[in-house]
Amino acid sequence: MAKSKLEYIWLDGYKPTANLRGKTKIVEDFSGKLEDCPMWAFDGSSTRQAEGGSSDCLLKPVALYPDPVRRDGWIVMTEVLNPDGSPHESNGRATIDDDDDDFWFGFEQEYFLWDTDTNLPLGFPKDQTPQGQFYCSVGGANAFGREIMDRHLDICIDAGINIEGTNAEVAAGQWEFQCFAKGAAKAGDEIWVARYFLERLAEEYGIKIEYHPKPLGATDWNGSGMHANFSNSILRTCGSKETYEKICESFRPVVQEHIEVYGAYNDQRLTGDHETQSINEFSYGVSDRGASIRIPIMTVEKGYKGWLEDRRPASNGDPYKIAARII
């Protein structure tokens, strides 16, 4: 009988930022179908999701991807449930109200490749070279860690993740990848599984993936975000500037509610500098990368039929919770 390795992954209960966890189940003659992935359980007392006296939490399979790295391997994205089958309080995916997949999301995941010996980004200049030359750069003096980024790209493509692009970002050792999905839950699945593959690569290279939105502190270096491009049928078809402005204005009264789920330490990034709006302000505008919400020029050129970009989410945010809040 053929044996397959099913890696069940989930989000733990650590606050303010959840971590990925995973463990392997060996299954004989696996069909390769999500519906044939059995429910499983884990010790929630070791992940801050349960007390020791009643520590079992359930893992409900919700998405399945082939694992290009492990022979006969699969990645099983799961939701964490309480023993009675109800969603655990840490389960952001269960809060998404998008049953008809009307909302489409494209997340732009920025991150740093972090040298654990120097406690600085890979290639960080010792001579105080300012940022600028590193964005979309090439060459050994500009781009650091490209092999890791390229391997990650290939793994995601081979796994069936709808990754749409990558680029070197503004700071040294900083990179970005973009994933798009029709359906908010699926968009979150894609980001989390892509993050999982990136973390596994980091193990091989002996580095850390740094998702902190401002890991270099209050310096003249960019932080990392996870811009959320989103649309629904109204945004894709309305053809109305007034409708777009009305939707943008609907975000103004709930700024704090959004910031609360857009990632920890985001106040260090949303300062009004480095292509951000202040965390205490709200604005929107066409092609304005200093706004809270940007109206892309392509949307305008298509007669206000397209999407919006919320530029506030941090790189360490939970895409499930971000999408649920936007919806």
Region locations from a protein language model:
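Glycine-rich, acidic/polar active-site loops that bind/position phosphate-bearing ligands
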Residues: 1-327
